[in-house]
Amino acid sequence: MITFIPRDKVSKNWTIIGPILSIFLTVFFGLLIFTFLGYNPLETLYQIFLSPFSRIDRISDILVKACPLIIVGIGLMLCFRANVWNIGAEGQFIMGTLLAGSFALLFPSVETKFFIFIMIVIGFIGGALWAFIPAILKTKLNVNEILVSLMLVYVAMLFIDFIVRGPLRDPMSFGFPLSKPYSEGAIINKIPFPGIGYLGQLHYGILFIILLIPISWLFVNKTLSGFKINVLGAAPKAAKFA
């Protein structure tokens, strides 16, 4: 039987060398695979690591794509602090966006931007309800949350694929799996820069992310609720009697 014994002291050198070595090996074997597939490894390296940062509009598009991922990461940070291994964030993100998007399609003529805040709340509710399934199975039946949350990702992917090809499909999509267009009030405006104009698709959502990061840090480290989450993860048995 294999047993794992934690070290008494963690090597300071390996805390630095470990991540660097992991990145190097990942890049090396990745380039090796691309080489076997017939691609130029140097061109592959450029396209993956340098090309996205070669133009300002490409950098802005990276920031746009990072916005929802950062929100998901903050949510997972709370889970991991509580020692809950939720790896179904992708499915929860899908169901949250599906619920928020479906709600927006119910009001095709709304123009006020306050509507976006309502969509955000509904999106959080949709993701939370999807996460509630592995949570209730874990707390009531002691079902492994890793397996359940992972399997629900594929359920969510298939479900949204069905929805955009069925109930939410735009009759004018010419057979493509596209939803009906959203109203002006359901779309986040792009940021205009003086003398430059718009930088790709960069929108005001990035400002929300900039505010959300320090707020999340303050919540986890400076509030009673954050302290409870930390205690739950560090000492779950003690947390039951708290």
Task: Describe the residue ranges of each PLM region.
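A cytosolic-side transmembrane-helix exit/cap motif
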Residues: 63, 110-113, 138-143, 165-175
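Single transmembrane alpha-helix segments in multi-pass membrane proteins
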Residues: 33-37, 53-107, 120, 124-132, ...
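Membrane-interfacial amphipathic/re-entrant helices at transmembrane-helix boundaries
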Residues: 2-71, 113, 118
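Membrane-helix/interface signature in polytopic inner-membrane proteins
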Residues: 215-242
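Hydrophobic core segments of alpha-helical transmembrane domains in multi-pass membrane transport
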Residues: 19-35, 72-76, 97, 101-103, ...
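Transmembrane helix-bundle core of multi-pass membrane transporters
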Residues: 149, 153-222
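Membrane-interface starts of transmembrane alpha-helices
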Residues: 10-25, 92, 111-123, 144-148, ...
